[in-house]
């Protein structure tokens, strides 16, 4: 299907939220909601759930257990290739926070087994030993196996926010309220740093390359994305007015400022005052973050029971996926460097595809919208035919590739095992499918 056809497949469906629920569970229109006979991606819901379980419990988790998890010192040694061969034993503070969240979430929602809680606990204990001393200092980005800094913080707050996300989810798993309090302290620190007018001047290089002009104090869609995800998960555990303000501020920034009415797409970078820059950055649309941010905002609309907001974010999610879709080889591109010139980065990253799968399944679960089913079906077919490496003897999936995601090119990329976006997709979608099955009275 070409992009134009996909954009016009179905008029926007009325998307409402069952006000009594805080998690996605029931579509407003019971005549359209999925039932156990629903077929997605050529499978019944039960068959699809079984596939997701195999991908998670038979492939991903055993590989992590055998090759990546440091059972002695705690944490994750993710610098390894698809066979499990390690490049080194260094660890990343980003991947520690992310990994803690993954295993704590797994324990809380899918498999209440002590071994998973132990992995999460040992990871957070490991990374907390390298906690920075200064109130506004950030975590070292890379650590040795025993926790000594290899590289210092690079000025981005993402790593500390991922640690906060892990702490909060571990607090839920253990009942240790101190972990939640520490997470809030980290969020507050990150907001302070983000609000500085000189925050992260080199941010443009992430999207436009080394020659990108400095952009100190830019407002970054990716930062709002992580802030709202961390804050709203924490608010599911405990009411907190300060975190509510963080969540509302993040939603407002994306909804009313990053959204470009002319493009009907989200700009990644804005001026510090949230005005649109009068230079090349006004043409930058990082579709990967746009898609990822919007499914998170769908969850937030559900949490705050705002039906109209859900509708808006569903429409914008659909628009971003449609524009980013590669009509020739399939999948979505992640980086539209210049809208008017139609200038894209032509690689394919797994995480961006998995964000499409999360968002489209969420919309379909709650509405039964034909366009969401179609989006999920074709993206799932593309992903499953492109990224899994079983044909090469590995249970993991390629984390990135060129436009065609060719295996020989993938092998030339940095050796890394992705321990966050992939299991997050598997877990969130497995939970969504199970909810759909449960509501049909069959399991």
Question: Across the structure, where does each feature detected by a protein language model lie?
Answer:
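N-terminal export signals
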Residues: 5-25
């Amino acid at each position: 299907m070409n992009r134009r056809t996909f954009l016009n497949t179905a008029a926007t469906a009325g998307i409402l939220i069952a006000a009594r629920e805080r998690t996605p569970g029931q579509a407003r229109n019971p005549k359209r909601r999925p039932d156990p006979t629903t077929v997605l991606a050529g499978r019944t819901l039960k068959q699809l759930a079984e596939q997701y379980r195999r991908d998670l419990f038979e492939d991903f988790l055993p590989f992590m257990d055998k090759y990546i998890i440091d059972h002695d010192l705690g944490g994750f040694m993710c610098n390894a290739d698809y066979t499990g061969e390690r490049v080194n034993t260094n660890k990343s503070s980003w991947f520690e926070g992310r990994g803690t969240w993954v295993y704590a979430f797994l324990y809380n929602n899918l498999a209440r087994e002590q071994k998973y809680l132990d992995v999460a606990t040992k990871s957070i204990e490991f990374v907390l030993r390298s906690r920075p001393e200064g109130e506004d200092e950030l975590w070292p980005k890379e650590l040795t196996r025993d926790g000594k800094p290899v590289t210092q913080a690079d000025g981005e707050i993402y790593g500390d926010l991922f640690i906060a996300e892990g702490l909060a989810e571990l607090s839920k798993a253990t009942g240790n309220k101190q972990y939640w309090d520490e997470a809030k302290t980290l969020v507050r620190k990150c907001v302070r740093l983000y609000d500085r007018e000189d925050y992260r001047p080199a941010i443009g290089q992430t999207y436009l390359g080394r020659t990108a002009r400095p952009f100190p104090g830019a407002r970054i869609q990716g930062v709002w994305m992580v802030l709202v995800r961390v804050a709203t998960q924490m608010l599911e555990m405990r009411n907190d007015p300060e975190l509510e303000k963080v969540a509302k501020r993040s939603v407002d920034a994306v909804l009313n400022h990053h959204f470009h009415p002319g493009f009907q797409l989200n700009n990644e970078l804005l001026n510090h005052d949230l005005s649109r820059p009068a230079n090349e950055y006004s043409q930058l649309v990082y579709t990967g973050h746009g898609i990822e941010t919007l499914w998170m905002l769908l969850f937030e609309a559900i949490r705050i029971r705002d039906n109209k907001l859900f509708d808006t974010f569903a429409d914008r999610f659909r628009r971003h996926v449609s524009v980013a879709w590669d009509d020739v080889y399939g999948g979505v591109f992640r980086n539209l460097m210049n809208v008017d010139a139609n200038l894209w980065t032509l690689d394919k990253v797994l995480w961006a595809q998995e964000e499409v799968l999360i968002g489209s399944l969420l919309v379909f679960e709650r509405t039964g919208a034909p366009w969401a089913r179609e989006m999920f079906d074709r993206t799932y077919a593309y992903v499953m035919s492109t990224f899994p490496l079983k044909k090469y003897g590995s249970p993991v999936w390629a984390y990135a590739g060129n436009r065609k995601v060719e295996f020989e090119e993938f092998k030339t990329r940095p050796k890394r095992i992705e321990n966050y976006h992939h299991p997050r997709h598997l877990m969130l979608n497995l939970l969504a499918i199970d909810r759909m099955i449960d509501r049909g009275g069959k399991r």
